UniProtKB/Swiss-Prot annotation:
Keywords in alphabetical order: Chromosome, Chromosome partition, Cytoplasm, Meiosis, Nucleus, Phosphoprotein
Subcellular location: Cytoplasm; Nucleus; Chromosome
GO cellular component entries: chromatin; cytosol; linear element; nucleus
GO annotation, biological process: chromosome segregation; meiotic DNA double-strand break formation involved in reciprocal meiotic recombination; reciprocal meiotic recombination
The protein's name in its UniProt record: Linear element protein rec25
Subunit structure: Component of linear elements (LinEs), which are similar to synaptonemal complexes, at least composed of rec27, rec25, rec10 and mug20. Interacts with rec10; the interaction is direct.
């Protein structure tokens, strides 16, 4: 009973950790890919600005500055979206960890209560049999369980 509960809880925690790591890795990979695409787009725009600047200096500079500003604004918006998504994911992870901790703690308390009840029953059986050493052993176990339960 105890091993099953602990194994089940351990399995849930491991599955959650794997899922969290996978999601985090995917999010980081997406962010890196996005940043690389933005850098590439920016470099292309920069190259275009240099080419056009040589042909029509004044007019092209004004147009390209506007394009660069738009690109920067789009980049900032995308970075804000990624940041927001990462904050949401972190919040979700924190909630899931709290749920696992709460469930695990509840399971452990149930196990301790069950063990305490079984120890009391064993003490009654030993007291009826008159075994002094067994009774002392069970009394010691009860004391241990009661101190860990508090």
């Amino acid at each position: 009973m105890v091993k099953g509960s602990v194994t089940n809880t351990s399995s849930i925690v491991k599955q959650f950790e794997k899922s969290s790591i996978k999601h985090e890795t995917e999010t980081i990979a997406f962010a890196k890919q996005f940043i690389n695409e933005c850098i590439r787009e920016f470099q292309e725009q920069k190259d275009n600005v240099v080419e056009e600047k040589n042909t029509d200096q004044n007019h092209q500079n004004q147009n390209q500055e506007g394009v660069i500003i738009e690109i920067y604004q789009e980049l900032l918006q995308k970075v804000d979206l990624i940041s927001s998504e990462l904050r949401q994911n972190l919040s979700s992870l924190q909630l899931r960890f709290q749920e696992v901790e709460r469930d695990t703690g509840h399971d452990l308390l149930n196990v301790l209560n069950s063990l305490s009840q079984e120890a009391r029953l064993a003490q009654k059986v030993l007291e009826e049999d008159g075994s002094q050493q067994g009774s002392q052993l069970i009394q010691g176990l009860l004391t241990c369980f009661q101190s860990t339960g508090n």
